[in-house]
Curated annotation (Swiss-Prot):
Name assigned to this protein: Protein translocase subunit SecA
Function, as annotated: Part of the Sec protein translocase complex. Interacts with the SecYEG preprotein conducting channel. Has a central role in coupling the hydrolysis of ATP to the transfer of proteins into and across the cell membrane, serving both as a receptor for the preprotein-SecB complex and as an ATP-driven molecular motor driving the stepwise translocation of polypeptide chains across the membrane.
Protein species of origin: Caulobacter vibrioides (strain NA1000 / CB15N) (Caulobacter crescentus)
Residues given in the record as ATP binding sites: Q86, G104, E105, G106, K107, T108, D512
Residues the record lists as binding Zn(2+): C906, C908, C917, H918
Principal cellular location given in the protein's record: membrane
One of the protein's GO biological processes: intracellular protein transmembrane transport
GO MF term set: ATP binding; metal ion binding; protein-exporting ATPase activity
Amino acid sequence: MLGFAKKLFGSSNERKVKTLATRVAKINAYEAEYAALSDEALKGKTAEFKARLEKGETLDDILNEAFAVVREASKRVLGMRHFDVQMVGGMVLHFSGISEMRTGEGKTLVATLPTYLNALEGKGVHVITVNDYLARRDADWMGQVYNFLGLSYGVIVNGLSQGERQRAYRSDITYGTNNEFGFDYLRDNLVYSVDEMVQRGHNFAIVDEVDSILIDEARTPLIISGPTEDRSSFYKTIDVLVKELILDKSMFDHDEKQKQVILTEDGQEKIEEILMSGGHLAEDSAGLYDAANVSVVHHVNQALRANILYTRDKDYIVKGGEVVLIDEFTGRMMTGRRLSEGLHQAIEAKEGADIQPENQTLASVTIQNYFRLYKKLSGMTGTASTEAQEFDDIYKMSVSEIPTNRTIQRIDDDDEVYRTEREKNEAILKQIADCHVRGQPILVGTVSIEKSEELSKLLSTFSFEKDGKKVKGIPHQVLNARFHEQEAVIVADAGVPGAVTIATNMAGRGTDIQLGGSIDMRLFNWRQQQRGMGLEITVEDEAEERARLETEIADKKAQALAAGGLFVLGTERHESRRIDNQLRGRTGRQGDPGRSKFFLSCEDDLLRIFAGERLDAIMRTFGVQEGEAITHKWLNNAIATAQKRVEQRNYEIRKNLLKYDDVVNDQRKAVFEQRQEFMESSDLSDIIHEMRRDVIDDLVLRHLPPKAYAEQWDVEGLTERVKSILGLDLPIAEWAAEEGIADEEMKERITKAADEYAAQREVIITPEQMRSVEKSFLLQMIDLQWREHLMHLDHLRNVIGLRGYGQRDPLNEYKTEAFSLFEKLLGDLRTNTTRWLMTVEIAYAEPEVPHTPLDNLVEVHLDPLTGENAAFAGGIPEGLSTAQREALPVSALPEGWDRTNRNAPCPCGSGKKFKQCHGSLVR
């Protein structure tokens, strides 16, 4: 019935796109009129639109004209005209949706439409990309259109000063990575002056590669942290003990499907015995699970996880003595990102690497809750429909599949499933050799560094026939986390006839494989070659070389097309269908032909864990011989079903984590908003006075209960607390002995004495100085209390799941206890602020507020595209002073770079001129 209705009325996506398509005709109606305008008249439209908005019109009212203006400006400035389907994509973004557009359909150009329209309000538009390079490239490229139309743009990248960030955020349009925007938000809530804040609100955001950022990054919070006590020696000790323990597999249970490992009863007894004999358990403790040994149990569990669940060259690599995580979705190194709760230190101990100290969280926010700060949020990607439910549930964004400008010519073959990995690899090698001989470029996708290097070794020794001769070794390139520095060169040649490229998951890479090769990269290499020979490059020389290369690349493209276009070969299915679709999407761009096929085996992780035994039994039943594969539509459906189950499980995990984080998020917003009010206020004396009154009320209520007799009062306790918190030595015992004295009168006397003492202390310095001291104390105290609160919440989150065994809902328990902890935070804030201001000796000096309020801050910062810490480029830290740069030798640059023309693009691929990038390092 549902299928019939869909045929009759069309899917909801088709209806939505059809509705928006009718509006495109109205936009197109302005094209001839605007084409006839002079440049000045076209630029004047921006001021006209702003004036109309001020008079009460809405963005929706001027959408048709604004989109038409951007299209015309783009034609004049970039020589690029928005297709009608791109107009539809732009409208989806404006209406807070997700535009699913295929590879090569021009998402970057589409973003200019809603960006310009929403920037007219003057509240700022943020365009989020996955790395600094793309942020710079897109800003400089599309910024030409914005500048032409009278709007300003800025770029937020790693290494900018506070002033540069402020200027970028005050632009009409700001480009940057999700990490930079998120960390700026956190840093803004750690500074002590409004003048130090850089962001100006969260109005409208367009997220490129939205599935990568809002789904893949959803379980990883952005964290700013500071160092704590060094326990590296204990990690090493526990690792040695656990390594010895797990030699006997009966000591632990390992659940691959749930990714869990726990000690068996025998294992618990054995490790307890070892720890006890080594003197690692607390004295007089009842055993390993005594409350006094909680920390030891935690170390044992993390060492167990490190040794059993985490595999070298799959989950992480060791590079330069450092353990670097690998993103399971992109295959990228995640330099700068560390596992929490001591797990990263446990892996470092396992590998004998330098153990970095643990860090205490100072401020954190999940990607989900950061982006939910925006009043309006939209996104673009090539693959979002498989996660449509999650986008709708969590972000309230619907996914719209935008039709391609040209019909997709790609053929997706059924999967081939073999019994063993060896048989599968043999079939893969034959397929690669066939493509190579026929001149068809092939991209081979693997799920890990380990797999890509294994396949590379097999290709190097594989023998095949070419031109009637026996040849050993298929020439190929490997692109994985180890060699990502060579990515631009490798991807540029991946579309050349006969090219073989092995790559770990290509998700989120922003790469566009062009059949025949990339003319830009070929030109760049030619320039480098000419300069290396000391030759001067003229405009005529470059134009001549470009024409020659265009002809050569056109010929090579024709050869690749004749061979069938780019062949994408998947060596395993990923847990997520979206990652598989991203790999497939690398071929068949802009109407080019292409082919994709997955080669699987019953020993692959996905099939082995979820369907391995059943599938192997079926193959035996049907008498599948060695080297034979089974291929069938029902098999594809069965694999897709397994993937859906995993996706649903992962979604439930993310959704569950979000429920817990929402509890923290409500508290975070309350604290950050209160902190903001404190910073913006020039006089907090009323708040300080109110806090002091509340503290006195609490003290009297606790020690002099309202319905108790005077004889039952804790007079001694109240006297001590008043002295320690208020700095007052009052005759409270004498007051309590008075006939008919009541708790209210006691409260009034203490309050009066406290007010008088506070007034006396104000005389020590001027009122203005006192206000400054109060503000400084209050901000420092709220930061201190918030850090401790986050630590308590982390501990609570780690143990709250055990409440489920007592038939209690862990989430409700967490909400209740988190609220109690928050109330304690507020009480401690009042008490400690009052104690500081009433007891600390005041000696005022003009404060020198540093840009960063805390030393030794660590940003857990991932660049999803390059995988490297963006603070470093080519091994040279960005943001060096002139003196520091002058102290660097020319040899600090990679070999040959010092001969680069100063006005040429920098070889590092940043998009900047050489003199503005690595050239600035040369004296």
